[in-house]
Amino acid sequence: MAGEKTRKILVDNRKARFEYEILETYSAGLALLGTEVKAIRAGRANLNDAFARIHHGEVLLYNMNISPLQTAGAFAHDPLRTRKLLLKRREIHKLTGRVEEKGLTLIPLKLYLEGSWVKLDLGLARGKKLYDKREDIKKRETKRDIERAMRR
């Protein structure tokens, strides 16, 4: 179909789903430099320590590491620079109200290509306690044991 855009996931932040309880997700564009887009397409991005904050009505992404390509030479970008996320004004106002609640934060979940655009799935999240993490591990192990028993 002509209007349908393909979605190719480039980076997945699996650690975020373990460390945080995701309440809502938002899709946001990123304001990037040309060398950053090329590096992301080459799979040189890392979301592990990244987080987002709202500052003066803009959503900014911190600590997302995009390693520069060796071919960039003198045009190489700063790998850890702060990047602006592109969201609708309504979404930013909604997020501002929610982030001010105690214990909620913005965590990047996935970095993907939609057509030729690099986009990011942003999650409104609450940190999990240690016992919640242990409970998730137990559920995952019991599910794996059940599937293993069903295959026999």
From Swiss-Prot:
Sample GO molecular function, one term: RNA binding
This protein's record includes keyword RNA-binding: yes
Subcellular location: Cytoplasm
SUPFAM superfamilies linked: Small protein B (SmpB)
One GO term (biological process): trans-translation
One Gene Ontology term, aspect cellular component: cytosol
Sorted UniProt keywords: Cytoplasm, RNA-binding
Family: Belongs to the SmpB family.
Listed HAMAP family: SmpB
Main function: Required for rescue of stalled ribosomes mediated by trans-translation. Binds to transfer-messenger RNA (tmRNA), required for stable association of tmRNA with ribosomes. tmRNA and SmpB together mimic tRNA shape, replacing the anticodon stem-loop with SmpB. tmRNA is encoded by the ssrA gene; the 2 termini fold to resemble tRNA(Ala) and it encodes a 'tag peptide', a short internal open reading frame. During trans-translation Ala-aminoacylated tmRNA acts like a tRNA, entering the A-site of stalled ribosomes, displacing the stalled mRNA.
Protein name: SsrA-binding protein
Organism encoding this protein: Gloeobacter violaceus (strain ATCC 29082 / PCC 7421)
